[in-house]
């Protein structure tokens, strides 16, 4: 039986500076079978950042040019806000290049600086990927908000 595997990576940054002190929000959807069902995430700035991050993660009201892969529905159902933050950084690490099917490991983190966020995201990816795929984990996205570096 041939199984088609697709990794759903969705990353969109929607910037709405309606209030300079508004938090950034990160939403993630990672099913137990990330290898077969992929994963999704979204983040946004602004007063309604949580709603926007969830919408992006779920594939709702996507900005022009962003396409959600067909088999992302299970990951989308699991989308949840994992953090609101100001003057911090977040990172996503995966064991395959962006838009390539078949991830075994995905990690994410929010921290005071990019180095810490990236280190924690890599550790999460390596733990999920297991011994055979740990070395393939790499930070695929790292973003800082406000004064964080």
Question: What are these model-predicted stretches?
Answer:
Residues 1-8:
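Bacterial N-terminal signal peptides that target proteins for export
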Residues 13, 18-20:
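N-terminal signal peptide c-region/cleavage motif recognized by signal peptidases
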Residues 21-149:
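Secreted/extracellular ectodomain signature
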């Amino acid at each position: 039986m041939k199984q088609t595997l697709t990794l759903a990576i969705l990353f969109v940054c929607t910037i709405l500076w309606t209030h300079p002190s508004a938090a950034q929000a990160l939403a993630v959807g990672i099913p137990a079978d990330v290898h077969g069902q992929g994963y999704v995430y979204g983040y946004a700035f602004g007063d309604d950042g949580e709603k926007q991050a969830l919408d992006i993660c779920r594939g709702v009201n996507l900005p022009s040019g962003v396409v959600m892969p067909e088999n992302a529905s299970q990951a989308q159902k699991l989308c949840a806000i994992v953090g609101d933050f100001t003057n911090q950084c977040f990172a996503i690490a995966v064991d395959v290049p962006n838009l390539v099917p078949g991830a075994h490991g995905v990690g994410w983190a929010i921290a005071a600086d990019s180095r810490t966020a990236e280190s924690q995201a890599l550790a999460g990816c390596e733990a999920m990927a297991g011994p055979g795929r740990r070395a393939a984990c790499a930070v695929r996205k790292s973003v800082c908000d406000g004064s964080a570096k």
